[in-house]
Amino acid sequence: MQPNFEIMLQYVKCLIIGSGPAGYTAGIYTSRADLKPLLIEGIQVGGQLTITNEVENFPGYPEGSSGPVIMEDIRNQALHVGVEMRPGIVTKVDFSSRPFHCWVDDKDEIVADTVIVATGAQARWLGLPS
């Protein structure tokens, strides 16, 4: 008897890969443009800002704030304007022809007219004493 693997195929106008400030902002603007974006959250939901204790000079926070608070506010705004969010990791993307084909968690396939890659960066610590 073979295992039952359920594979999903989904079409979207706009797929956003990444859930940091750039991903959520892309979601907000593409949703307002009626592109009905799907945002795949990735490994670290909220990006590096979620591990930042103090953020200064960020628009809308004249007194500063913590990274997690800012990211929660941006995420809530994205949800409010209709961004669909889904957990998972995009494991493969085929940009060779349109529409683009993307795979999430090595199984679910998403076909998208537009793909926005907002995967952010990863901190590389120098290992210097504090």
Q: PLM features: residue spans?
A:
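N-terminal Rossmann-fold NAD(P) dinucleotide-binding loop
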Residues: 23
